[in-house]
Amino acid sequence: RAKESGVTLLYTPFAREAFVFIVNADNPVNSLTEQQVRDIFSGAITNWRTVGGNDQEIQTWQRPEDSGSQTVMQSQVMKNVRMISPQETEVASMMEGMIKVVAEYRNTNNAIGYTFRYYATQMNADKNIKLLAINGIAPTAENIRNGKYPYIVDAFMVTRENMTSETQKLVEWFLTPQGQSLVEDVGYVPMYKTLH
């Protein structure tokens, strides 16, 4: 819409975030390879035993098609591999009666889902959920900062190209050590030097 209105947008990266896979804390699996993740969500692997877990059917949980999580899952993780159909649930709609929507993650012993690290560790922290390592690399702040963890996205400030001086000052402040320390304090991974 900005382009249609003749507005040019400027994207300024200021933080890093990891796309993570979550399982029940009691699941004995601690790490999956990138290929195993693709195989699980494409339906090629259907039992946890195949990847070193218990002899249980894998219960996959997805996100709605128009969500940021689903977009990252399809573009960075699955690449061109088709995903199995998501689990659905029926909900009441004022306009359409009962409609089917993608079901929310349920943290059963055989579940696997995905989200962003910030959501899993800050917004919706749950001691019964475990974040999996990928290729043996845990989604720690250090592994996100140094780029070792394979699924990383940058967070951007989006402004008009011709921003006001107040907006310019705010953008510049977020890139200072003080601004980057705030980024870190709230649970994201800073891109630049912090005060800490």
What kind of feature is each model-predicted range?
Residues 1-196:
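Exported/periplasmic ABC-transporter solute-binding proteins
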